[in-house]
């Protein structure tokens, strides 16, 4: 007795796997867009990047490790021209660098 797979063939399975891999790759980097919540790698010019590791000219980068020209960089370790870098070790032209040990033209730095 043969087992029928509801009309799916190996060809469709291969296509589905390729599409899945391509979509997964898209989550790594996002460029532009109002909502990049699915991006986990890098955001550039995005409006909402709460899960990205790296943010450039983006907003709401609450989990980013590195921020450049971005906002809400709450946990970033390195901030350049960014806002709300509460945990940053290094701040350049950034704001609210409360724990920074190296500050250049930034606000909120300890001892400044």
Swiss-Prot record:
Major place of residence: secreted
Compartments where located: Secreted
Disulfide bridge map: 30-39, 36-46, 43-49, 55-61, 67-73, 79-85, 91-97, 103-109
Record keyword Zinc present: no
Signal peptide boundaries: 1-28
Keyword Disulfide bond belongs to the record: yes
Keywords, ordered alphabetically: Antifreeze protein, Disulfide bond, Repeat, Secreted, Signal
Pfam families given in the database record: AFP (PF02420)
Cellular component annotations (GO), alphabetically ordered: extracellular region
Database matches in InterPro entries: Insect_antifreeze_prot_motif (IPR003460), Insect_cyst_antifreeze_prot (IPR016133)
Subunit structure: Monomer.
Comment text on domains: Forms a right-handed beta-helix that is stabilized by disulfide bonds. The building blocks of this beta-helix correspond to tandem repeats with the consensus sequence T-C-T-X-S-X-X-C-X-X-A-X.
Its job: Contributes to protect body fluid from freezing at subzero temperatures. Lowers the freezing point of the hemolymph by about 2.5 degrees at a concentration of 1 mg/ml. Binds to nascent ice crystals and prevents further growth.
Family, as annotated: Belongs to the insect antifreeze protein family.
Protein name per the record: Thermal hysteresis protein YL-1
């Amino acid at each position: 007795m043969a087992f029928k797979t509801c009309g799916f063939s190996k060809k469709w399975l291969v296509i589905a796997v390729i599409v899945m891999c391509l979509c997964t790759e898209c989550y790594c980097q996002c460029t532009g867009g109002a909502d990049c919540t699915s991006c986990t790698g890098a955001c550039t010019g995005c409006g909402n990047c709460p899960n990205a590791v790296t943010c450039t000219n983006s907003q709401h980068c609450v989990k980013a490790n590195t921020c450049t020209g971005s906002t809400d960089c709450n946990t970033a370790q390195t901030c350049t021209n960014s806002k709300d870098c509460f945990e940053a070790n290094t701040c350049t032209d950034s704001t609210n660098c409360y724990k920074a040990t190296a500050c250049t033209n930034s606000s909120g730095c300890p001892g400044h």
